[in-house]
């Protein structure tokens, strides 16, 4: 079954990506809701498909379904995180641009163990929490989603429905770049190409005795 929550959509078709000879699947609206669904026959494995969307104003748009991708955080990562032994958690949580199956996008992850729902909202989806609801990975408290088409420079926040029923927007605690105050949005950034120039300082730090030096 393919399901997609698409507010303001008039029609949706699931289009096979890697097997163009297969027929497209028209998704039907469920009642009066914004949910569309359709059945893929004889598909028991991971299935790559685009959503061809016709919006209410007649505009057409085609994109990969965010939920057609596997989680970008492994079970081992979650195991180490829950034990408190994940030493590079900043590489897992936050926002990280990447390419998956030839699709450019950004993987988002945040720890919100008491949340009822978490969505990533930003200028790429009209700040509408209905477009990119995230999925909780097991009982870890980590919510994750890969958002196709969201790239470097996109502004975003996490929209969280708390256990008390309050809907709040939060800045990413693992964000790499931010708007200038008083604005508070995080900005998707790629720091993999940053050239560090502190080799001399690192070497001197390793050679020095910290107990014999001033604290600052």
Predicted regions and their residues:
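Short beta-strand and strand-turn-strand segments in soluble, beta-rich domains
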Residues: 21-22, 126-131
């Amino acid at each position: 079954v393919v399901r997609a929550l698409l507010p303001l959509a008039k029609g949706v078709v699931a289009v096979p990506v890697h097997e163009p000879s297969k027929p497209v699947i028209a998704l039907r609206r469920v009642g009066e809701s914004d949910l569309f669904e359709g059945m893929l026959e004889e598909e028991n494995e991971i299935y790559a498909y685009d959503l061809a969307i016709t919006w209410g104003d007649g505009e057409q748009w085609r994109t990969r379904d965010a939920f057609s991708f596997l989680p970008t955080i492994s079970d081992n990562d979650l195991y180490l995180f829950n034990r408190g032994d994940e030493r590079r958690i900043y590489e897992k949580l936050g926002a990280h641009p990447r390419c998956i199956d030839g699709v450019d996008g950004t993987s988002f992850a945040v720890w919100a163990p008491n949340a009822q729902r978490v969505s990533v909202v930003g200028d790429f989806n009209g700040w509408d929490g209905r477009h990119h609801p995230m999925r909780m990975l097991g009982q870890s408290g980590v919510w994750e989603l890969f958002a196709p088409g969201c790239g470097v420079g996109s502004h975003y926040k996490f929209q969280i429905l708390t256990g008390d029923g309050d809907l709040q927007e939060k800045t990413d605690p693992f964000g790499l770049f931010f708007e200038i105050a008083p604005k508070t949005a995080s900005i998707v950034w790629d720091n993999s190409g940053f050239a560090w120039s502190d080799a001399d300082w690192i070497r001197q730090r390793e050679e020095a005795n910290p107990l014999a030096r001033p604290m600052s």
